[in-house]
Design a protein with these regions (language model features):
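Short, basic/hydrophobic alpha-helical segments
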Residues: 81-102
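Acidic/histidine-rich, metal-coordinating catalytic segments
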Residues: 16, 98-112, 141-144, 149
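A short acidic (Asp/Glu
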Residues: 23-26, 113-117, 151
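Conserved Walker B catalytic segment
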Residues: 116-124
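RNase H-like polynucleotidyl transferase catalytic core
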Residues: 37-48, 123-153, 166-167
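Mobile genetic element proteins and their domesticated derivatives, centered on retroelements
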Residues: 14-16, 59, 86, 106, ...
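Extended, low-complexity cationic-aromatic segments
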Residues: 1-88
Length: 197
C-alpha cells in the first residue's frame, strides 16, 4: 500500500458492498432540537409496497483523493455485477490517468468466485495487450478481520446520517440521501444482464 500510495499512476481502493435499509434503524445517539433524546420509531413496509425493503450498494473508497464512488444494485451483489462495477471504476480511474488499482476487499463469495477471477484475468490481459486501461491488483483482507476495510466506518456513519426520524423513505429517496452523504452523483443502478433465449 505504501508503494501504491507514493506512485502517481497507482490508486489504492477499498471496495465493499452495503445494504441500505428503509426500515432497520442504526445505532444512534442524538438529541432532538428541543434537547430531548431523539426517539426513533421502528417502521414497517406494507405488504403491497412495490419498493424493496433495502437497497444493495457497491462502494469504492479512494483515500488518496478522499472520494467514495457508489453504484446501487437492482437485486443483490453477485459476481457479474461486481465485474460491471469494477469496469466502471476502471474507466473513471483511467480518466484520472491512473494505470493500476490496488483493490483491497474482503473474502465475500462473489469476490473470490471463478467468474470474477476469470473476469479480472481477462481484464488485465486485455489492457496488457492494448496498453490502455487500469490494471487491477487484488488484495484480500484476512477472513477474521473485515473491519480492516477502510470503507466500513463510512457505511456506519452514512447510515446514521440518512435515517428518517419522521417516516419511511422511498427507495429512490434513500438512494439520493446516501449519494448526498457521500457527495457523489446517483448513477443508474447496476443490474444483471438478462439472457435472451
Amino acid at each position: 500500500m505504501e508503494v501504491a500510495g507514493s506512485a502517481s499512476e497507482w490508486a489504492v481502493g477499498f471496495e465493499d458492498e452495503c445494504w441500505w435499509s428503509r426500515v432497520a434503524l442504526p445505532t444512534l445517539n442524538a438529541c432532538s432540537p428541543d434537547g430531548e433524546p431523539l426517539r426513533l420509531i421502528q417502521r414497517s413496509v406494507a405488504r403491497d409496497d412495490p419498493e424493496p425493503k433495502a437497497l444493495s450498494c457497491y462502494g469504492l473508497y479512494l483515500p488518496q483523493i478522499d472520494q467514495t464512488w457508489l453504484r446501487f444494485v437492482d437485486g443483490r451483489p453477485v459476481s457479474s455485477i461486481t465485474a460491471r462495477f469494477l469496469g466502471w471504476c476502471s474507466q473513471k480511474l483511467e480518466a484520472q490517468a491512473k494505470k493500476v488499482l490496488v483493490l483491497i476487499w474482503d473474502n465475500a463469495s462473489w469476490h473470490i468466485s471463478k467468474e470474477l477471477r476469470r473476469w479480472l484475468g481477462s481484464h488485465n490481459r486485455r489492457l496488457k495487450r492494448s496498453g490502455k486501461g487500469v490494471r487491477i491488483v487484488v488484495c484480500l483482507l484476512p477472513k477474521q478481520s473485515p473491519w480492516l476495510n477502510a470503507i466500513e466506518p463510512k457505511w456506519i456513519h452514512g447510515k446514521r446520517k440518512v435515517v428518517e426520524a419522521d417516516g419511511l423513505l422511498g427507495a429512490y429517496e434513500l438512494a439520493e440521501r446516501v449519494c448526498r452523504v457521500f457527495d457523489c452523483p446517483h448513477h443508474e443502478h447496476l443490474t444483471v444482464p438478462q439472457k435472451v433465449a
